[in-house]
């Protein structure tokens, strides 16, 4: 369960919890006191449990983006159309821990998604942040978030595969003081272990 101001984004991945879905929704609606709730039940783990993948609004109305503040920066979240449940809250404390080290630095944010690392770094005094992602919508959100946070002039975007971008930046002689590598899961199943391990070694 992730909360974005007046909106909850909820994901169920197991058949046991799916059976309790009506009760879960009723309790969250009662306890959280929010205006809307989204079911982000589109994870591949549901297929292993024989459950359909779906995204739906449980109640209320959701108008994207929904704005939140994290570590002094503003981010427009897409609970319905974004990745995962809309944002990666699990890295919030790690992002905060990095901020004392970024003042005056050139920052490279690989697999940036909405710029959680790069935009925060710019807000905390980085000279510049380059956010790299293969997704055009993700990079559009980076630009929007940077402008909303007052650091649009110091945040750039590059739409490219992160592996290819690293090679191109190295060949161009680019140098960075801080590099953030926050990739998606390369090993989602046991059969992915060998190739996934190679990918982690390559990107690091």
What are these regions (language model features)?
Residues 1-13, 76-77:
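Short, aliphatic-rich beta-strand segments
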Residues 2, 18-88:
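Non-catalytic substrate-recognition/targeting regions of SAM-dependent transferases
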Residues 60-204:
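Rossmann-like S-adenosyl-L-methionine
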Residues 11-16, 94:
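Secondary-structure transition/turn motif
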């Amino acid at each position: 369960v992730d909360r974005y101001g007046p909106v909850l984004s909820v994901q169920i991945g197991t058949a046991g919890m799916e059976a309790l879905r009506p009760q879960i929704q009723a309790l969250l609606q009662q306890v959280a006191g929010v205006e809307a709730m989204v079911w982000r039940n589109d994870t591949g783990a549901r297929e292993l449990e024989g459950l359909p993948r779906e995204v739906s609004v449980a109640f209320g109305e959701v108008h994207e983006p929904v704005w939140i503040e994290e570590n002094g920066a503003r981010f427009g979240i897409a609970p319905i159309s974004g990745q995962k449940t809309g944002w990666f809250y699990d890295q919030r404390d790690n992002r905060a821990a990095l901020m004392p080290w970024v003042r005056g630095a050139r920052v490279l944010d690989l697999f940036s998604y909405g710029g959680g690392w790069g935009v925060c770094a710019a807000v905390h005094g980085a000279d510049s942040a380059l956010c790299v992602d293969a997704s055009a919508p993700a990079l559009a959100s980076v630009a929007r978030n940077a402008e909303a946070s007052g650091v649009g002039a110091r945040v750039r975007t590059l739409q490219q595969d992160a592996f290819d971008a690293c090679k191109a930046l190295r060949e161009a002689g680019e140098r960075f003081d801080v590099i953030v590598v926050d990739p998606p899961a390369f090993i989602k199943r046991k059969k992915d272990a060998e190739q996934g391990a190679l990918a982690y070694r390559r990107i690091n």
